[in-house]
Amino acid sequence: MVLETLNPLHYNITSLVPDTMPVATVPILILMCFLFLIWNHEETSSIPGPGYCMGIGPLISHGRFLWMGVGNACNYYNKTYGDFVRVWISGEETFIISKSSSVSHVMKHWHYVSRFGSKLGLQCIGMYENGIIFNNNPAHWKEIRPFFTKALSGPGLVRMIAICVESTTEHLDRLQEVTTELGNINALNLMRRIMLDTSNKLFLGVPLDENAIVLKIQNYFDAWQALLLKPDIFFKISWLCKKYKDAVKDLKGAMEILIEQKRQKLSTVEKLDEHMDFASQLIFAQNRGDLTAENVNQCVLEMMIAAPDTLSVTLFFMLILIAEHPTVEEEMMREIETVVGDRDIQSDDMPNLKIVENFIYESMRYQPVVDLIMRKALQDDVIDGYPVKKGTNIILNIGRMHKLEFFPKPNEFSLENFEKNVPSRYFQPFGFGPRSCVGKFIAMVMMKAILVTLLRRCRVQTMKGRGLNNIQKNNDLSMHPIERQPLLEMVFTPRRNANENQGDGMDQH
């Protein structure tokens, strides 16, 4: 009887469906369930990070890099998801890492020596499979690197000390060239001029227009930073990338002229030994057929922009920190007077300037300029338990790493952070391993020589309310102050113990 009662209900159930759910809704529900399953599948990734979300996730993450800049985006993702994060750039899986053990693993292994970036962007700036900085062809990079290694070490490293002293002194004597209408010093421009001059004297050795080349380098860097991660469609819209292409062409053209001057000079000198610098070695390698003219031009360009691009900003930030921390300045000056005295700094002084060295390290930790390293996995791997597929992009967020582990006062500027020996895995401003910064040793020599020479001559001061935290910065490919702001100006005052001929160039300031 019960079954008989239920049977009519069974037979008539379909007649009730239209009243409660339209038939057209059923396929939509099925599709939604299918998409929900896909969504859930993507969310089960063992690596923290934003979800794939039917392809929306990769678009959003790439868009965030373009909108915020590489450095800011990396900090956002690490802060939000942890020290090992999966995102996407140009649809490619990308890991952002700020954990010291993972960072060390990547740096020390050869299968992470390749770089990544937009092929069209790198082609536009001349770095695609060329030069050394972003050359993503490991075989060709290995052929090019020895030219840089030779120029940046050995006799060249020792010569650079005297060159830095000479250049710093000359530029301090010509401070009027970087003095504003209010009588203040454009310290960043001063550092850029010194860096370009020292690079030219050691690596190229031809007359050049400092001011013009510095401006061309700034524009080239802006193009490099803007184009590195742009999607391919950007390059199909000519008016969008015209100004960047023009900036690249401008610097390349200037460098080609300077290199041609070098060729002419080499063809007329009697003793080649006296003129065998970095550019000469490249030119002769081209003559032997080992390099192309394009290789030579790009390598010289990269050698000439490296210091004005990064070291100049690093030194500028250091001058601001010195002005903000007078007790640190006093410690440094006491050491300089003890170690160097009244003479110019020499190579033997370098290892004895411990306080100056700790100041440089702490400045680079607290206010880094290059705070990330970009690599690509050339084979499958596992990093701290996370699977890494061949072709995965890797961004090492070393700037964040330097403020998360080991240091007693990670969020403060304090020389106490380097009072004790710091294990290398916790502090890597230049990286290490097969693709570490090729100029890391000469960079330390240059910074010491320039700081000592400058501080012996004058005291540096910031304008009231214009400290490091007040300066607007752009954290993209590297950390740079936003140009054309009065906060970049400083006051240089001659020291009392400077002799008269040293002080003349700065009396008006």
UniProtKB/Swiss-Prot annotation:
Membrane topology qualifier: Peripheral membrane protein
GO cellular component, one term: endoplasmic reticulum
Keywords recorded for this protein, A-Z: Heme, Iron, Lipid metabolism, Membrane, Metal-binding, Monooxygenase, Oxidoreductase
EC number: 1.14.14.14
Cofactor(s), names only, from the UniProt record: heme
InterPro entries tied to this protein: Cyt_P450, Cyt_P450_CS, Cyt_P450_E_grp-I, Cyt_P450_sf, Cytochrome_P450_Monoox
Catalyzed chemical reaction(s): testosterone + 3 reduced [NADPH--hemoprotein reductase] + 3 O2 = 17beta-estradiol + formate + 3 oxidized [NADPH--hemoprotein reductase] + 4 H2O + 4 H(+); androst-4-ene-3,17-dione + 3 reduced [NADPH--hemoprotein reductase] + 3 O2 = estrone + formate + 3 oxidized [NADPH--hemoprotein reductase] + 4 H2O + 4 H(+)
Cellular localisation: Membrane
Pfam families xrefs: p450
SUPFAM superfamilies, alphabetized: Cytochrome P450 (SSF48264)
Keyword Iron assigned: yes
GO molecular function: aromatase activity; heme binding; iron ion binding
Residues at which heme binds: 437
PROSITE patterns named among the record's database cross-references: CYTOCHROME_P450
One GO-annotated biological process of the protein: brain development
Domain of life: Eukaryota
Protein family membership: Belongs to the cytochrome P450 family.
Described purpose of this protein according to its UniProt entry: Catalyzes the formation of aromatic C18 estrogens from C19 androgens.
The protein's name in its UniProt record: Aromatase
